[in-house]
């Protein structure tokens, strides 16, 4: 016997005003004249209904990412790269979200993981006046959009926690337009800003933290040039917990005497996924008729990567990390989790396979879709040498596609061999340490050692490019 089901809900009005009602249209026209509906048209062009009852956070973010014209870097269907809520899986398993929904922090994490700039404010970190100012700023722009996390009961609606984008603002009435992504339940509607603030100023029982709002915009450059936190890796959350929660406790419990002992606490018994947590970004391109030349844009990007890598290697922290790794070489088991994929051919095979997935749709695990891995060294400008790793991808039953992986740096050794061809374990661990909050080290008992560690890990004196790399990694870890 079929169940009756539900067909929509009556929008509680007041306090809400249906966007399509005569009064809702009047408010829209007035707000349009005030210049606070500028973001509406981009948002409504990509406005969609969430595909699952608990996907409000994913659908909201999908609307905003598409409105900002952010390239997801992977295919949706056919040849098309496009954000769909089923693709936002890098911070929380979709099966878990489908049952439990998603929290404020994880939505912010998803936005960052997918290439957006995020400014997140929980209600206890802001005021209603701050919120109003930011609503006006975002609604007066096409380039910044505001997402709200609120409890529906505050608007006399059925349901609990919910996410939606804000589509506009009316100054005289002090009302905001909520583009509700549960369009099967409620239509877009205007609500008083202060009432929405009260609905945001509530506790999410899943985390014990306040709800809030976040501003999403497009990054002016790639989120990271050389390194990225691998939040798509299934073990990333356990690694983040180890680094931000366990490490501070371990440091407090040990009587440490020098930097080497501090590094041992952090790296001797890490989670098995640590080696995958921060990875270097390689550039992948299709092979074009055996063309081995680089475009000016490719040369520029590789030069920046080489600069950042050089900046890492000139830090005192890098020297300490290198010394610690050298001291552990004879204990292979100790550092196996950190170095099991440090050889360029193995790394390149994995990157080649990821590139193949992006460029051809061939997505096989473990680098199995790439064959005939070949390493070449190209003179870029008679001074700098770039490493080019080529592979062949079987993209169909009989067709093949050549794929090139551009490696950031190649230095020639005394015998003419290429050395230091890619970011090493020492480079990655250095960036990882720099990305941790300074309060991580505050529990070190020996005051002089604590001061020395803090000095080593302070980022304010780093070169700007390296600061930006570290800042992005830090923000991702904290979310």
From Swiss-Prot:
EC number: 2.3.2.15
Up-regulation conditions: By cadmium.
Gene3D superfamilies with a match to the protein in the record: Phytochelatin synthase, N-terminal domain
Superkingdom in the source lineage: Eukaryota
GO BP terms: cellular detoxification of cadmium ion; detoxification of copper ion; phytochelatin biosynthetic process
Keyword Nucleus recorded: no
Domain Peptidase C83: 1-221
Active-site residues from the entry: 56, 162, 180
GO molecular function per UniProt: glutathione gamma-glutamylcysteinyltransferase activity; metal ion binding
Family named by the database record: Belongs to the phytochelatin synthase family.
Protein name per the record: Glutathione gamma-glutamylcysteinyltransferase 3
């Amino acid at each position: 016997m079929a169940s009756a089901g539900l067909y929509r809900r009556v929008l509680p009005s007041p306090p809400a005003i249906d966007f399509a009602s005569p009064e809702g249209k009047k408010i829209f026209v007035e707000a349009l004249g005030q210049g606070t509906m500028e973001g509406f048209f981009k948002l409504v062009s990509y406005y969609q209904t969430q595909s699952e009852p608990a996907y409000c956070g994913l659908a909201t973010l999908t609307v905003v990412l598409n409105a900002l014209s952010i390239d997801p870097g992977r295919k949706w269907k056919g040849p098309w790269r496009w954000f769909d809520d089923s693709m936002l899986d890098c911070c929380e398993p979709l099966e878990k979200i489908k049952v439990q929904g998603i929290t404020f922090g994880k939505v912010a994490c998803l936005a960052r993981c997918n290439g957006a700039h995020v400014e997140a404010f929980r209600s206890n970190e802001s005021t209603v006046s701050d919120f109003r100012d930011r609503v006006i700023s975002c609604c007066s722009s096409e380039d910044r959009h505001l997402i709200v996390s609120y409890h529906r009961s505050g608007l006399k609606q059925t349901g609990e926690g919910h996410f939606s984008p804000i589509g506009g603002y009316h100054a005289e009435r002090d009302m905001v337009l909520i583009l509700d992504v549960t369009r099967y339940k409620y239509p877009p509607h205007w609500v008083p800003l202060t009432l929405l603030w009260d609905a945001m100023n509530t506790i999410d029982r899943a985390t014990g933290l306040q709800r809030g709002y976040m501003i999403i915009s497009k990054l002016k450059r790639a989120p990271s040039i050389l390194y990225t936190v691998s939040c798509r890796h299934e073990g990333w959350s356990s690694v983040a917990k180890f680094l931000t929660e366990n490490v501070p406790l371990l440091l407090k419990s040990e009587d440490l005497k020098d930097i080497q002992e501090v590094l041992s606490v952090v790296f001797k018994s890490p989670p098995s996924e640590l080696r995958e947590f921060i990875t270097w970004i390689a550039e992948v391109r299709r092979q074009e008729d055996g063309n081995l030349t680089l475009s000016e844009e490719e040369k520029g990007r590789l030069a920046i990567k080489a600069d950042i890598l050089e900046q890492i290697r000139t830090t005192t922290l890098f020297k300490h990390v290198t010394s610690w790794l050298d001291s552990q070489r004879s204990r292979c088991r100790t550092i196996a989790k950190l170095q099991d994929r440090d050889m360029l051919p193995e790394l390149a095979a994995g990157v080649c396979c990821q590139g193949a997935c992006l460029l051809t749709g061939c997505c096989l695990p473990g680098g199995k879709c790439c064959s005939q891995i070949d390493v070449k060294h190209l003179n870029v400008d008679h001074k700098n040498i770039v490493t080019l790793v080529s592979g062949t991808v079987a993209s169909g039953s009989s067709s093949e596609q050549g794929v090139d992986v551009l490696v950031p740096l190649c230095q020639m050794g005394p015998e003419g061999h290429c050395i230091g061809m890619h970011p090493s374990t020492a480079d990655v661990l250095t960036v990882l340490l720099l990305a941790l909050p300074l309060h991580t080290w505050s529990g070190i008992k020996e005051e002089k050692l604590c001061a020395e560690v803090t000095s080593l890990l302070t980022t304010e004196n780093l070169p700007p490019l390296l600061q930006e790399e570290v800042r992005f990694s830090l923000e991702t870890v904290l979310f």
